[in-house]
Amino acid sequence: MDVTAKYELIGLMAYPIRHSLSPEMQNKALEKAGLPFTYMAFEVDNDSFPGAIEGLKALKMRGTGVSMPNKQLACEYVDELTPAAKLVGAINTIVNDDGYLRGYNTDGTGHIRAIKESGFDIKGKTMVLLGAGGASTAIGAQGAIEGLKEIKLFNRRDEFFDKALAFAQRVNENTDCVVTVTDLADQQAFAEALASADILTNGTKVGMKPLENESLVNDISLLHPGLLVTECVYNPHMTKLLQQAQQAGCKTIDGYGMLLWQGAEQFTLWTGKDFPLEYVKQVMGFGA
């Protein structure tokens, strides 16, 4: 790719960032489509995020992806949020239109799209959702919008627990889905929730390097063949949770599905063009 002065810059702001496959994926897509953009990753944490947004405006960047730990903070630095992003309380995409910043969340639509593409119908189903960060709440919100009957959210009593309660209230007030929040330390409640669940989704960092040998499911017998187990983590590709799920006879969806579909939507938001999906799946080794 020959980058010229006509090229516009798209960023990714996160910390840590070295593990991300998004720059490779987006740049391959941009090159295939012949579009005058280049995508670069920047190590940005909560402390440096405000300055990074000022830099985005000053450099007239087309926009940026936003990942951990900035997804919730980023809502405070855009001029407009989509209705879904307001429901989530977090964004992963910013589009810059001449200094006017719009915030979107494609994590939820991407993950739910990956589930649907597998042939699974979420309408009327119950999801056990692990975590209350930006990815988890995005998945929960989109699932509620698209027809989940119930979401049983489990999170440790950390700084995200109150945010989880607020998220549940927003979803309960604005959709037909019923969301409950329970301390993950309550293993009896966790076991009971899994027994009646249709979907288990991990939206936490547990399973991601350097936590690749960990899983929030301590007892594999809690998993049953009728359960669909989905993962947000894609590095490593086969997390411990997915290994447990396959051993238990569950159908699984790895983190590549969410990465692909959320990235496809981002691509269109930034460029106005269709994402070369089949090409990217092939060159990135994401499979069918």
Curated annotation (Swiss-Prot):
Resulting phenotype, Q262A: 3-fold reduction in catalytic efficiency for both substrates
Q: Which domain of life is it from?
A: Bacteria
Q: What is the effect of changing K71A?
A: 3200-fold decrease in the affinity for quinate. 170-fold decrease in the affinity for shikimate
* InterPro entries xref list: Aminoacid_DH-like_N_sf, NAD(P)-bd_dom_sf, Quinate/Shikimate_DH, SDH_C, Shikimate_DH-bd_N, Shikimate_DH_fam
Name one molecular function that GO assigns to this entry. Answer: shikimate 3-dehydrogenase (NADP+) activity
The residues that hold NAD(+) are A132, G133, G134, A135, N155, R156, R157, D158, K205, C232, V233, Y234, N235, G255
Q: What class of enzyme is it?
A: oxidoreductase
In UniProt terms, what function does this protein have? The actual biological function of YdiB remains unclear, nor is it known whether 3-dehydroshikimate or quinate represents the natural substrate. Catalyzes the reversible NAD-dependent reduction of both 3-dehydroshikimate (DHSA) and 3-dehydroquinate to yield shikimate (SA) and quinate, respectively. It can use both NAD or NADP for catalysis, however it has higher catalytic efficiency with NAD.
Family stated for the protein in its record: Belongs to the shikimate dehydrogenase family.
Q: What is known about its subunit structure?
A: Homodimer.
Name it.
Answer: Quinate/shikimate dehydrogenase
The organism named in the record is Escherichia coli (strain K12)
